[in-house]
């Protein structure tokens, strides 16, 4: 009787050990699945962040190139406007010179006309 109780007790302990081992393996498998799922979820976020960073880097390079082109074009426009401004000043200078010459010519013409009229009046008729 004692040996039968001992065998039953050992059998129940073996069943409990097997059940405990089975549950331990299931817990390890579940923990592994959870870990893999978490890693996959984090990897998706990291991959997305990496792709976004690459896109941002590309956009920054494009923006730098366009900003440099804009600066160059702006410099060219400034040069053209300065040249145009200088040309307008020169045209204004020529216009003032022409007015001055015209005024001098009118003065000379008036003086010559005055002298001519004076000579006609003083000439014996």
Swiss-Prot record:
Component of the biogenesis of lysosome-related organelles complex 1 (BLOC-1) composed of BLOC1S1, BLOC1S2, BLOC1S3, BLOC1S4, BLOC1S5, BLOC1S6, DTNBP1/BLOC1S7 and SNAPIN/BLOC1S8. Octamer composed of one copy each BLOC1S1, BLOC1S2, BLOC1S3, BLOC1S4, BLOC1S5, BLOC1S6, DTNBP1/BLOC1S7 and SNAPIN/BLOC1S8. The BLOC-1 complex associates with the AP-3 protein complex and membrane protein cargos. Interacts with ATP5F1A and NDUFA9; involved in their acetylation on lysine residues. Interacts with KXD1. Residues 1-31 form a coiled coil. Keywords: Coiled coil, Cytoplasm, Lysosome, Membrane, Mitochondrion, Transferase. It comes from Mus musculus. Its EC number is 2.3.1.-. It comes from the Eukaryota. InterPro entries: BLOC1S1. Transmembrane segments: none annotated. It catalyses: L-lysyl-[protein] + acetyl-CoA = N(6)-acetyl-L-lysyl-[protein] + CoA + H(+). It is found in: Mitochondrion intermembrane space; Mitochondrion matrix; Cytoplasm, Cytosol; Lysosome membrane. One of its GO terms (cellular component) is mitochondrial intermembrane space. Its main location: mitochondrion. GO terms for molecular function: protein-lysine-acetyltransferase activity. One of its GO terms (biological process) is peptidyl-lysine acetylation. The gene is Bloc1s1. Component of the BLOC-1 complex, a complex that is required for normal biogenesis of lysosome-related organelles (LRO), such as platelet dense granules and melanosomes. In concert with the AP-3 complex, the BLOC-1 complex is required to target membrane protein cargos into vesicles assembled at cell bodies for delivery into neurites and nerve terminals. The BLOC-1 complex, in association with SNARE proteins, is also proposed to be involved in neurite extension. As part of the BORC complex may play a role in lysosomes movement and localization at the cell periphery. This is Biogenesis of lysosome-related organelles complex 1 subunit 1. Pfam families: GCN5L1 (PF06320). Belongs to the BLOC1S1 family.
């Amino acid at each position: 009787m004692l040996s039968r109780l001992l065998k039953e007790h050992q059998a129940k302990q073996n069943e409990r050990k097997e059940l405990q081992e089975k549950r331990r393996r299931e817990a390890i498998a579940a923990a592994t699945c959870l870990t893999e799922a978490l890693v996959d979820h984090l990897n998706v976020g990291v991959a997305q962040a990496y792709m976004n960073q690459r896109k941002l880097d590309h956009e920054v390079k494009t923006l730098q190139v366009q900003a440099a082109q804009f600066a160059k074009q702006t410099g060219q426009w400034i040069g053209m406007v300065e040249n145009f401004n200088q040309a307008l000043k020169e045209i204004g200078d020529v216009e003032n010179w022409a007015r001055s010459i015209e005024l001098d010519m009118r003065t000379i013409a008036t003086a010559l006309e005055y002298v001519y009229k004076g000579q006609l009046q003083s000439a014996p008729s």
